[in-house]
């Protein structure tokens, strides 16, 4: 059986947290893929000639042969189904309830905590940008993040569900918006996010982002 041709589309700076998530999913699966970029600042993603125009006009966009898919959580779930364990590495928990919880965490991180995303955009994470102090809304959102994360994390475990899963990367990214800016974060969550950030697949993306930014 021939290997599929896989392409992942990213923003030109590799700042997108959702591209990071899709990148890590592909890397952890052990899949070979090509990277292509599109300049969001100039509106290239809004041109009808771009492959992602007929999807959501956002990155990441995954292309596998003649199939195209956008939205990072959909990409991760598709990869888990198409390149399924045990033949391929697992990126979601084996346990049914834990797998559902991981997907809940992913959905929550993408739909909530808007003040953090607005006040601590990912140029803070990948380019060391400095922003104004958190507003009252930002602080309230951070407190919600801390409370939820501390409830989800089992004391003494470095991952959400024992074994690493893709939701760990997504949660660590949200926490690191604050940690890497120097905002006050509970020590337990700093340790968790720092540990997750050392994962090889994450470090490869950070290096790629630094290369583009530098």
Curated annotation (Swiss-Prot):
What this protein is reported to do is described as: Exhibits glutathione (GSH) S-transferase activity toward 1-chloro-2,4-dinitrobenzene (CDNB); however this activity is as low as 1% of that of GstA. Also displays a GSH-dependent peroxidase activity toward cumene hydroperoxide. Is involved in defense against oxidative stress, probably via its peroxidase activity.
Q: What happens when the gene is disrupted?
A: Deletion of yfcF decreases the resistance of the bacteria to hydrogen peroxide.
Presence of the UniProt keyword Ribosomal protein in the record: no
User: Which InterPro entries does this UniProt record tie to the protein?
Assistant: Glutathione-S-Trfase_C_sf, Glutathione_S-Trfase, Glutathione_S-Trfase_N, GST_4_C, Thioredoxin-like_sf
The protein's annotated catalytic reaction(s) are: RX + glutathione = an S-substituted glutathione + a halide anion + H(+)
| Annotated protein name in UniProt | Glutathione S-transferase YfcF
For this chain, one GO molecular function annotation is: glutathione transferase activity
How its function is modulated: the record gives: GSH transferase activity is inhibited by S-hexyl glutathione.
Which residue ranges does the record assign to the GST N-terminal domain? 6-87
> Which species is listed as the source?
Escherichia coli (strain K12)
Family as reported in the entry's similarity comment: Belongs to the GST superfamily.
Taken from the UniProt record, the cysteine pairs bridged by disulfide bonds within this chain are none
NCBIfam families named in the record: PRK15113.1
Ranges for domain GST C-terminal: 95-214
* GO biological process: one example: L-phenylalanine catabolic process
Q: Which gene encodes it?
A: yfcF
E.C. code: 2.5.1.18
Pfam families to which the protein is assigned, alphabetical? GST_C_4, GST_N_2
**What is the activity's pH dependence per the UniProt entry?**
Activity decreases as pH is lowered from neutral to acidic.
Q: Which UniProt keywords apply?
A: Oxidoreductase, Peroxidase, Transferase
Q: Which SUPFAM superfamilies match?
A: GST C-terminal domain-like, Thioredoxin-like
